[in-house]
């Protein structure tokens, strides 16, 4: 299961646990636009901002830590998005770098 799918399940589970909160009501409780929340729940927003997740957590009267503390996410292994550089390639890059200037910046 992907990170975004886990967030969707978490939001839906919390809505159910709290008496069937609707997307519109959660948006109001979270001080978010309904379209923002809809995009997250529909999977259109794959990686919501921390500030958005924080607002959702506050809407549920939780801290961000509490909101993100659930088994699926705790067991999730995030993949590195950055390119891994071969050590030999790294040496090539170091050789072509210019020496640092001794000039003092104003």
Question: What name fits each language-model region?
Answer:
Residues 31-48:
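Recognition helix of helix-turn-helix/homeodomain-like DNA-binding domains
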Residues 5, 9, 34, 49-53:
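Short alpha-helical elements of helix-turn-helix
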Residues 11, 26, 37-40, 67:
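Conserved hydrophobic/aromatic packing and binding residues within compact polymer-binding modules
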Residues 1-25:
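A short, Lys/Arg-rich alpha-helix, primarily the initiator
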Residues 51-66:
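DNA major-groove recognition helix of helix-turn-helix/homeodomain DNA-binding modules
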Residues 16, 42, 72:
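Residue-level detection of the helix-turn-helix DNA-binding "recognition helix"
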Residues 39, 69-106:
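Short, charged recognition helix plus adjacent turn
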């Amino acid at each position: 299961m992907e990170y975004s799918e886990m967030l969707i399940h978490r939001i839906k589970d919390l809505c159910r646990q709290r008496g069937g909160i609707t997307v519109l009501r959660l948006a109001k409780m979270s001080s978010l636009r309904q379209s923002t929340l809809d995009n997250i729940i529909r999977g259109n927003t794959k990686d919501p901002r921390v500030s958005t997740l924080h607002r959702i957590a506050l809407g549920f009267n939780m801290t961000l830590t509490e909101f993100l503390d659930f088994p699926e996410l705790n067991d999730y292994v995030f993949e590195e998005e950055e390119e891994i550089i071969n050590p030999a390639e790294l040496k090539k890059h170091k050789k072509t770098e210019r020496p640092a200037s001794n000039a003092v910046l104003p």
